[in-house]
A protein has these predicted regions:
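Charged phosphate-binding loop/patch that engages nucleotide di/tri-phosphates or the phosphate backbone
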Residues: 160-191
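Divalent metal-dependent catalytic cores for phosphoryl transfer on phosphate-bearing substrates
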Residues: 13, 40-154
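Conserved N-terminal diphosphate/IPP-binding helix and adjacent helical/loop segment
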Residues: 1-5, 27
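A short, charge-rich alpha-helical start-of-domain segment used by transcription regulators
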Residues: 22-24
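Active-site helical microenvironments for divalent-metal-assisted chemistry
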Residues: 7, 42, 101, 157, ...
Length: 191
């Protein structure tokens, strides 16, 4: 189950009142990128892609947390009955379905980490998961970035970027370029 576009916009606006910051605009940019790419993919619904992109970081509503925002977003969306969004809140940080590749602080309790790992192990990644992972890697807070520049920025901020995650982001870009028959940057109007 998922919220409508209007409901998703309202959820994000309410979240911004609780914890404003660059993550809100990043979420909007992620959503716009996802919508544009999905329009060119036969098996994806652009409205659904927009909603999933808009709410992928909704766990940030509850404060400044790193891995904790994955837990917070997942449990928040599950509590509202939005299981499809909850799945994206969970998968957007784990291209290769492993918590080991998380970039940032492991600021979760043992119980929260166990829930993340257990839920992640049950997930079958689909093209929506892959699309939001790609768009998350393209979206800055001020606009669309070259994916390699964005990964370098993250590496500079956190001191590392796992090579396998780097490689998987490039594979995602290539996957959607092949699927759409277009250059990703042209699709999302990256200048």
């Amino acid at each position: 189950m998922m919220p409508t576009r209007a409901e998703a916009e309202k959820i994000l606006e309410e979240a911004e009142q609780c914890n404003s910051g660059p993550w809100v605009n990043h979420s909007r940019i992620t959503a716009k990128c996802a919508e544009k790419i999905a329009k060119l993919c036969e098996n994806l619904d652009s409205e659904k892609a927009y909603i999933l992109g808009l709410l992928h970081d909704i766990g940030r509503k509850f404060g400044v947390r790193h891995l904790g925002h994955v837990y917070d977003g997942y449990t928040y969306m599950m509590s509202l009955g939005y299981d499809e969004v909850a799945k994206i809140c969970l998968t957007h940080s784990f291209n290769n379905s492993t918590v080991k590749e998380y970039i940032g602080k492991f600021d979760v309790s043992d119980e929260e980490l166990e829930l993340i790992e257990t839920a992640l192990a049950k997930v079958n990644m689909d093209d929506y998961d892959k699309l939001i992972q790609l768009c998350d890697a393209l979206a800055g807070s001020d606009g669309v970035l070259n994916i390699e520049d964005r990964m370098r920025d993250v590496k500079q901020r956190y001191g590392y970027y796992p090579q396998e995650k780097w490689n998987s982001n490039i594979r995602l870009k290539n996957y959607f370029e092949k699927k759409t028959g277009n250059n990703i940057y042209k699709i999302v109007n990256q200048s």
